């Protein structure tokens, strides 16, 4: 019996080591090459202006962290959920929450414009979809813009569906006014 337990213990240790080596290899092959680029693209959103702080806070309330990983890593396939779980692990390990939400604001997919071109990033989406720079948007428009990347094909600027669905988060505007 002790021989079986020892054999089982060695097997568990070997599996854990293989998993750890797999995570490290995955980090160096998939995550490390884009980690700094992603953070550099989010530099505007990491500023401490009241508006960028508000947008990061609104993004944190509207979208959970696992959704952030899905936005940053969108490869379809059977192993998609497993890869998203690994990305969540690495993202939580490498970045603060502010950095994660800044990257999300910088790189989120907002659907297609009227010419059929893909729209990425909150600054670009504000100009393309709302025809206003993000710094000049009303609070309600900012909340709607952040809400839109839940499902860009369902929520279009000015649509009744977007207004109704984002209504719950309009309390964020009241909080911003009070601060």
From Swiss-Prot:
The protein's name in its UniProt record: Uncharacterized protein YfeL
InterPro entries associated with the record: Glyco_trans_51 (IPR001264), Lysozyme-like_dom_sf (IPR023346), PBP_transglycosylase (IPR036950)
Gene responsible for this protein: yfeL
One Pfam family cited in the UniProt record for this chain: Transgly
């Amino acid at each position: 019996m002790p021989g079986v337990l020892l054999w089982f213990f060695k097997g568990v240790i070997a599996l854990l080591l293989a998993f750890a080596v797999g995570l490290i290899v995955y980090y160096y092959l998939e995550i490390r090459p884009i980690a700094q680029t992603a953070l550099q693209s989010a530099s505007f959103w990491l500023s401490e202006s009241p508006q960028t702080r508000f947008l990061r806070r609104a993004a944190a309330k509207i979208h959970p962290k696992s959704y952030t990983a899905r936005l940053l890593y969108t490869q379809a396939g059977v192993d998609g959920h497993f890869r998203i779980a690994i990305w969540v692990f690495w993202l939580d390990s490498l970045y603060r929450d502010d950095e994660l939400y800044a990257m999300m604001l910088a790189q989120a997919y907002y659907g297609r414009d009227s010419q059929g071109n893909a729209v990425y990033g909150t600054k670009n989406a504000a100009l393309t979809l709302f025809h206003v720079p993000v710094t000049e948007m009303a609070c309600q428009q900012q909340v709607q813009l952040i809400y839109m990347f839940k499902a860009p094909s369902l929520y279009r600027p000015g649509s009744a569906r977007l207004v109704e669905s984002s209504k719950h988060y309009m309390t964020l505007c009241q909080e911003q006014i009070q601060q």
